[in-house]
């Protein structure tokens, strides 16, 4: 069983990494192609392309200029410790043990516009490039065209390494924008997408902030409980959520909570 997460826009490169243990991204040469493309853009182009402020555009133009194919402790940080958003608040990697991080390294993947697929302990240089960005490139009009089947094939390889755990299953805890880079026809696995709904205004609905955090919390649950069979995820009951069999189907598992009446 392999879990996929989305990355975060917010990054933390100020807090020192709590471990020196690391691996390297597996698509560095492909990332370098994207960086070369991004370096051709002026700050105003980056701002328009990504719909971000002038200040953020300048910051990211600087990041692209400083990005190097040589990853070091000075310019990089482990992905799961560098990402800093709702999902990663739920995952809370900084409080995981070394054994937990070792399990995550085998069972959790982070989809990325620049890096394709990251393992938790992969060194990562700071960047901003969302998967949905319409950055034209030699392969097509956007990053889905750029990555093609590559991301899916690497996920297949990673799941093949877990075949002793049972039938290959990909647990989709990523956003729709990011999971679109995974091609179901190429994927050699069953897909399960957990959905988190909260009671509000007289009905259950997905509330983005809560859903993002819950995705990270479920990934953490899978790591700390050493979950290798998808069925065990149905026992997830963190933060008041509970599996709702009646609202679920084979590929869409609904977890609901009711904090207000």
Swiss-Prot record:
One cellular component term from this protein's GO annotations in UniProt: cytosol
Membrane-crossing residue ranges in chain numbering: none
Superkingdom of this protein's organism: Bacteria
Short name of one Pfam family: H2O2_YaaD
GO biological process: response to hydroperoxide
Annotated signal peptide: none
Family to which the UniProt record says this protein belongs: Belongs to the UPF0246 family.
Stored NCBIfam families: PRK02101.1-1, PRK02101.1-3
Name the record gives this protein: UPF0246 protein Reut_A1014
Protein source organism: Cupriavidus pinatubonensis (strain JMP 134 / LMG 1197) (Cupriavidus necator (strain JMP 134))
